[in-house]
Each structure stands twice: as C-alpha cells, then as structure tokens.
Amino acid sequence: MIASIAKKSMLPFAFVTTTVFAQSNAPEPPKVEVVTSIESQQWIGISPISRNTIWVSGVDGRVARSTDAGFSWDYSQPGPGDLQFRDIEAIDDRRAYALSIGDNGQSRIYFTENGGADWRLRYGASNDTFLNCMAISPQGEAWVTGDSVGDEWRMVRSPSGRNWIKTNSAVSAKPQSNEGGFASSGSCVRYHNDTWMIGTGNADVARVLIKARFGIRFDVIETPMQSGPGAGIFAVYPESKDNFYIAGGHLQAEQNDQPRLWHYQSGKFTALPEPPLDGTLYSLDKVDHNGEWLLTSNPSGAAAFHLQSKTWHKLSDANIWNIQCHGDAACWLAGKEGYIAKLVWKPAQAPQTNVVP
C-alpha cells in the first residue's frame, strides 16, 4: 500500500465565451467555467461521476478529486512521482482506478477505495508492454489496451476489477506491424451502450476493434482515418457495433490533410465537417442537450459540434487534452498549466406542444 500525498485547495471560477463558426438556428452552446489548480500540473485523464464529483489524473504521478463541483480539490499520489497517469476511471466518489503509461514497468493500474487517501497497485505490466487507455463498464468489467509487440496484441482484462489478466487472443485478427494506440486522453478504448470499442493507429491502416458486451472477440473494421507512423484514431465513441464515431489525425499538425472526424453507420463511413481546431483530435464525447452534440479537444482548444444543424462552436483556445461527460450536462475539460474546467449548459428547453382552443 502506498500512502497518498493529500492537500486541499479552494479555487475561483472564470467564464470563457464561445465562438460560432457557422450561422444557423442551432441552440446556444455551453460556456466554459475555468478552475485553476496546480499551475505547473498537466492534467490528462478525466472521470466525472455526477454533477458534483469529478476525478482527474496527469503527469508527476498526481490525481485530484472534487466532490463539490470543482470548488475545492483533494490531491493524491498513487505511486512514484515520475508516473504519468494518462487515464482514470472512477466508480464513485470513493473508488477509482488510475492507469499510468510507458514501458520498462511504467504501465500500472492503481486502485483506491477511500477517495484517494490510500492507493493499491492492482496490475503491473511487463517491461515490454506500453498500455495506453482503459475503460470500465457499469458491471465492473474492464479492458485496457496497449501497443502490440510483434504479432501479439497487448491487452489486459478484468471481469470485476479485482483480478487483472493479460490477454493476447481477444481480437479476431492479428495486429499490423507497430499497431497500437495513443495515450493522449485515455479515449482510445470505451464502453458505451453495451459496446466495447478500441481505436488503433501508428500502422498502415487505422482500425476499429469492436464487440458487444457478451462478445467473445473483438471484430476488426478498417477505417479511412489518416494512418501511418504518428497517425490514426485517438478517440472513439460507440452508439452500437454498427454506429460509432472516431476522432484522430496526425501528430504533426501540418500533415493533417484528411478528415479527422468520422461517423460509421450501417457499414459506411461519413466524414463530418472539420472542427475549428489545428492538429489531431485528442478526445471525443457525445451528449444530448437541446439536440445532439459532439465534443472534442486538443492542444489548440476545445469545440462543440451540433449534429442537427452541422454547426461548430469554438469553446476555448487553451491547451486541452481531454473532454469527458457524465450524463447530459456534467462535462469537464483538462489540459496543461493546471487547466480544469466544466461546461455550463443553458437549461434544456421543454418540448413545445400545440394547444387546441
């Protein structure tokens, strides 16, 4: 057991206005309410549990938790200070799993059941394994994906969060040379709507690995996302096995000459309008609030896309690595220089009814 380093801070809020990039009758986008935490800290992982409880993780071996909607934060350190916690998956305000990334034994999974007061090491990867992203279902099943080694996938599964097992045979096809994921936001694996989904890159073809909740193996779908070294799928969002979104691109901003956001439905990929952000897209989420919205971010900012009106709204110019939501309104952003913020939505409009005199 490793004792945490905990301290609490009370933090002010600031509002940031948005920029509209198309004229339409789209509903009003959310505003960004910024909270400044440790100024030198880079936050990457986000796991909102409710409107009030949010966990974040980042470099320097640090995790933070707020239970009062971001007015104050408790900080903890699950392990050594040189670990980079690129992903965090919380169960509630007491229990959470934190994933650190890297090879040479740096890829680890820690668990707390007392709000970060203490952390236990639950899994340590071998020296040649580089884990990227983690997701946990409401039923407690977990999948962690890493970069392939030779002709083997490197994945870790837990049926309940207690025992973690390395698996190399969970995918219906072998990996391509150097195929793996990107640990930019913990968004390259996701569970949603009884569907497990993984996005890959750094290979000849960027692919989706996808299966239903009770599926035995992941099916493989080739995508039109830009591919090759430093390129591919960075974030995924499944509606079902036959309906999902992918975001990504190339780490070299000047090489992003292809669509970075795609929708797959009924066997067909459709490129969505390009967001007002430079460079590859690091994160992706979807909410339903006065219509359906896609949310994405990267080091050039964050943006919201209203699907019905096909309208982009630039939310921020900050260096934002991740944006994640819980439900239809509890959305949080995290990035460099201590950046933590939440989206504040205008109250949802009640559906109009026709009154017959």
Residue spans for each PLM region:
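Bacterial N-terminal signal peptides
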Residues: S9-T19
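Serine/threonine-rich, low-complexity intrinsically disordered segments
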Residues: S4, T19-F21
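Residue-level hotspots at or immediately adjacent to binding/recognition sites across diverse folds
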Residues: Q23-P357
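Bacterial N-terminal signal peptides that target proteins for export
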Residues: I2-M10
